[in-house]
Amino acid sequence: AHRPYAWIPSLQAIVGNIGVFGNMHVWTADTQSAAERAAWVAQLDEMAALKPALVVPGHMSAATPVDASAITFTKEYLQTFEKQLAASSDSAQLIAAMKNAYPKLTSGAMSLDIGAKVNKGEMKW
């Protein structure tokens, strides 16, 4: 993935990565291929392997824990998005599937809407 981050070993901290989200819909409009999203997941795996104690997500809703759970959340969201993208006939179906998979997410609805339209080929980005 092309998203740099800083690893601070003395603090066991990851900061500065815009590809880590906390408790909000993930922005996928900039990753329009399965390969790009797979590279993103690989970077998240790389980050998780460091076993950080502190993770400051680049995007998060209020009260999001600043720990490795944000890495796990983002990875699982992307994997769910990939599965639902393949199973959905259009963006409306994809949006509904993601809202069903993540019913508690209230932040980032516009990110989901645009990402679904772009990745289903209904909107140019």
Tell me the role of every PLM-derived stretch.
Residues A1-Y5, Q84, G121-W125:
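Short N-terminal signal/transit or membrane-insertion segments
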Residues W7, A13, A38-Q93, A97:
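Divalent-metal (often Zn2+) His-rich catalytic cores of metallo-beta-lactamase-fold enzymes
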Residues G22, A29-T31, I71, A101, ...:
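Generic preference for flexible, low-structure residues
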Residues A87-W125:
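C-terminal regulatory/interaction regions
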Residues V26, E36, Y77, A97-A101, ...:
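Generic hydrophobic, helix-prone segments enriched in Leu/Val/Ile
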Residues A1-A38, A42-D45:
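Catalytic core of the metallo-beta-lactamase
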